[in-house]
Amino acid sequence: MNTEIHYRKASENDIDFLLDLRTKTMNEHYTNSSLPTDRASTLQRVLYQFEKANIILFNNEPVGLLKIDRSKDPIEVLQLQIDPGQQGKGLGKTILQSILEEASSAGKKVSLSVLKSNKAQHLYSSLGFKAVGEDEHSYFMSFSDR
């Protein structure tokens, strides 16, 4: 797939975009998991480790969020959200494959968590992520080519 995916560091100017994105991509899953969907809870999730937030640009338009911590092993994908209007185009898969290649080159694993009600877990499994734990609401997944 020939995609023009770029990233830029998220800033305070992106908060409204990120609130809207999070509402569109996650509220259904939070509701299904009996987790709060009010604005304050959503803002708290947007601001969580905000210094690691990157706006995903597709053809120079903001289409999502990648929050990632590359500082340790495993590399942790904290949040990956693609606007529903851009889903199904392979963007998430392309982004994750790039992260997996980066991790492989660095000799690191990759971890993430996914709500049990979120169908994205099928994408993660198809890329080789394995569930290594769970809690009431989420699966904790890991990828390693070692």
Q: Language-model segments: what does each one mean?
A:
Residues 125-135:
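Conserved acetyl-CoA-binding loop of GNAT-fold acetyltransferases
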Residues 88-101, 122, 126:
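Conserved acetyl-CoA-binding loop-helix of GNAT-fold acetyltransferases
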Residues 55, 61-69, 74-81:
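Conserved beta-strand in the GNAT
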Residues 80-87, 114-115:
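A short, internal acetyl-CoA/4′-phosphopantetheine-binding micro-motif in the GNAT/acyltransferase core
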Residues 103-115:
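Conserved GNAT acetyl-CoA-binding A-motif
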Residues 23-51:
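Conserved GNAT-fold acetyl-CoA-binding loop/helix
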Residues 5-20:
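A short beta-loop-alpha structural element at the N-terminal edge
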Residues 92, 96, 117-120, 137-143:
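Short glycine/proline-centered loop/turn elements that form peptide/ligand docking sites
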